[in-house]
Design a protein with these regions (language model features):
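Solvent-exposed, low-complexity, repeat-rich "mucin-like" stalks and linkers
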Residues: 562-603
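Low-complexity "stalk/linker" and mucin-like segments enriched in Ser/Thr/Pro/Ala/Gly
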Residues: 573-579, 608-624
Length: 720
């Protein structure tokens, strides 16, 4: 069947009357005279999925059922009589060639998806229309829409994706559905009448050409209402607005400045996220906290003016902004997770005492940050607080801070000293992982908890001294610390773990103040040289020598560090002035704080005015806690600066004295004028300046004579 004429006298075409008649192309409904037709009702699916090309409804038809002409792929024109009051749901949906529709004067309601996915380019609504249903003109290529003054409701997605450039919504409209004009990529200007007080969720979402909007009576703008409106430069915020939904202006990348009026009392998360040209924002007094993600990824934002009543900053609120200083008011007491993550232009931050709640990751990846101060309002540096702050050098913690969280300073490559006060009792896992500028670690006895991998990858670390509170050395604690030479564990270490010293290829000494700890495995000491010495209490050394993994190293008794107690004759060993010693003194006795043993490896050198004294022979012996130095040679000539230098396996002592004689006449000394003086290392390399230790000095005088001598330079002389 390709053609059918419905005779006059038929009042109703039932549901599915010609449904699926795929060859039916021509339909005549009743008499050709529209005013005399008796047809009143066309049922659901009556002509759905037919090949009909044109539809003319007689004036008598008042009801057009749901799906009546749904998916009529050849339908191009429709004329609706003046009796039709409602178009059923999906009536002309998916009629992909439908370009022209003439509405009758009685039409009040356009049903859900009535013309969805049609090809209508222009729309003029008759005066009687009150309601446009959800999805009614979804994805039509509409370039012009004329709304009637009596229109009251525009449904959800009613004009989603249409091509209109200008919209004028009349004052009569009181309801604007969600997604109503979402995805209208050509829409530039919108005027919303006074009847609309709420712009629903996603109403103009991704209208990327939208530059201007007027909505004088609106008090509430819903979630994502203008999200992705990347050409919008002026935000429609007046002093009637009270509420802004989630993502409301997210991705509005043309906005440069923002003022939120005092009337706004509610702002959702992500409200201005990714407004990449926004440089300044002023917030009104209506809100008391910055919502989560409010300005996240506003990469040009440098200035925010906050009212004094703001008490909190939400999660990710200012992530990836361009702040150079923190926007903190006197009332802020809480900063939540990730609040300033990746703010790479921050160079210095100070958390005041009034802040009592700090979230995790607050300053993660702030790669420009150089200094930080944490006030006394918090007791802990939260987990991941400064994670990845690669240029952080100086950290000041309040004495009220008692713990450092997991990964708090992870990969802070610029950190040169440990920000640990006497108040710290706990340091979390990975706290200083990858802090490659740390050279030494000294933890007080107050620290009782030390997590795994705390100093993993601290490649410049040479020394670590742990207080008496530490009783466990966790997994990977010093892993891959390739320059680490010395670890002193003053506490009663009960256990070590896998990888504790793994990769410590320069380790020379480990001090363990206990019997062999449990937990060592084949991975604990990987790459630690077998020449490394394990210092343990004397009574435990035999057990170390018999314990797997520990016995692979040199076991030594742990003795107190040598310190000078007194000298005979009296000499200065504590930085005082030089004391007189007789020129014929042959014996020097130095008393230490403990017994001197072979492994202390004591040696001696006599220095006069910076030069080693070559005509003197020194012999060193020790007994108990005394070291005796016997001098063989001529009497010592007058000089105000002699140093008896004692060197041990751990340190060096410089003992100062002077020699003066009250009788005898010194021969006059004729000073020769120096032409050139050069310094060499002991292996003959020319030096730009004297260095610590022994230097070879070549002096050329004006008379042509040359003098070569050895000079001993103290560390403090190098610093001068």
């Amino acid at each position: 069947m390709t053609e059918i004429a419905i005779p006059n006298g038929v009042e109703t075409l039932g549901n599915y009357a010609f449904y699926g008649c795929s060859a039916l192309a021509t339909v005549t409904l009743g008499t050709q005279e529209r005013s005399s037709s008796s047809l009143k009702t066309i049922g659901d699916y009556a002509f759905a999925e037919t090949a009909v090309k044109s539809v003319v409804l007689p004036n008598g038809v008042s009801t057009l059922g749901n799906y009546a002409f749904n998916k009529c792929a050849s339908l191009a024109t429709v004329s609706l009589g003046n009796s039709l009051t409602a178009i059923g749901d999906y009536a002309f949906s998916d009629c992909k060639k439908l370009e022209s529709v003439t509405f009758g004067s009685a039409l009040e309601t356009i049903g859900e998806r009535a013309f969805a996915s049609a090809k209508i380019s222009s729309l003029v609504l008759p005066a009687a229309v009150r309601t446009i249903g959800d999805w009614a003109f979804y994805n039509n290529p509409l370039t012009a829409i004329t709304f009637n003054d009596g229109l009251q409701s525009i449904g959800s997605r009613a004009f989603y994706g249409v091509s209109v450039q200008t919209l004028n919504i009349p004052n009569s409209v009181t309801e604007l559905g969600s997604y109503a004009f979402s995805g209208c990529k050509s829409l530039e200007t919108v005027t919303i009448g006074t009847g609309v007080t709420k712009i629903s969720d996603y109403a103009f979402n991704t209208c990327s050409a939208l530059t201007q909007i007027s909505c004088p009576s609106v008090t509430e703008i819903g979630a994502s209402a203008f999200k992705g409106c990347s050409s919008l430069t002026d935000i429609p915020l007046n002093d009637k607005i009270t509420s802004l939904g989630n993502y409301v202006f997210s991705g509005c990348s043309a906005i440069e400045s923002l003022v939120i009026p005092n009337s706004v009392t509610s702002i959702g998360s992500y409200a201005f996220e990714k407004c990449t040209k926004l440089t300044s924002a002023t917030l009104g007094t209506g809100i008391s906290s910055i919502p989560d993600y409010m300005f996240s990824s506003c990469s040009a934002l440098t200035s925010v003016v906050l009212p004094e009543n703001i008490t909190g900053i939400g999660k990710y609120a200012f992530q990836s902004t361009a702040f150079t200083e923190l926007p903190l008011t006197a009332s802020i007491t809480e900063i939540k997770d990730y609040a300033f993550k990746s703010c790479t232009k921050l160079t210095s931050v100070a958390i005041p005492d009034r802040v009592t709640k700090l979230g995790t990751y607050v300053f993660q990846s702030c790669t420009g940050l150089e200094s930080a101060k944490i006030g006394g309002g918090v007791t802990s540096v939260p987990n991941y607080m400064f994670h990845g702050c690669t240029n952080l050098v100086n950290v000041e913690l309040s004495e009220k801070v008692t713990s450092i969280g997991n990964s708090a300073f992870y990969n802070c490559k610029g950190l040169k000293s440990l920000p640990v006060t006497e108040s710290i009792t706990s340091i979390g896992t990975n706290a200083f992982y990858g802090c490659t500028s740390l050279t030494s670690v000294h933890l007080s006895d107050q620290v009782t908890s030390l997590g795994a991998s705390v100093f993993y990858g601290c490649s410049s670390l040479t020394e670590a001294v742990l207080g008496t509170g530490i009783t466990t050395l966790g997994s990977s604690l010093f892993r891959n610390d390739a320059k680490l030479k010395k670890v002193v564990a003053n506490g009663k270490i009960a256990s070590v773990s896998t990888y504790t010293f793994n990769g410590c290829s320069s380790l020379e000494r480990i001090y363990i103040n206990n019997t062999p700890p449990t937990g060592a495995s084949s991975n604990t000491f990987t790459k630690v040289p077998t020449s490394c010495r394990i210092y343990a209490p004397a009574q435990t050394c035999q057990f170390y020598a018999q314990t797997t993994y520990w016995k692979d190293f040199v076991i030594m008794p742990w003795l107190d560090e040598l310190e000078i107690v007194s000298t005979t004759p009296s000499m200065s060993f504590d930085g005082g002035e030089a004391l007189d010693v007789k020129p014929d003194t042959k014996t020097f006795v130095i008393e230490f704080n403990r017994t001197v043993v072979n492994t202390d490896s004591v040696s001696a050198m006599l220095i006069r005015s910076g030069f080693p004294v070559e005509d003197q022979v020194l012999t060193v012996s020790y007994s108990g806690n005394e070291v005796t130095v016997i001098r063989e040679g001529k009497d010592l000539p007058n000089d105000p600066y002699y140093y008896l230098v004692l060197t041990t396996s751990d340190k060096q002592f410089s003992i100062l004295f002077k020699v003066t004689t009250v009788t005898g006449i010194d021969e006059p000394v004729v000073e020769k004028e120096v032409r050139l003086r050069e310094y060499y290392s002991v292996d003959g390399k020319l030096l730009p300046r004297p260095v610590q230790g022994i230097n070879i000095v070549k002096t050329v005088y004006e008379d042509g004579s040359i003098e070569v001598s050895k000079v001993y330079v103290k560390p403090e002389d190098c610093r001068r």
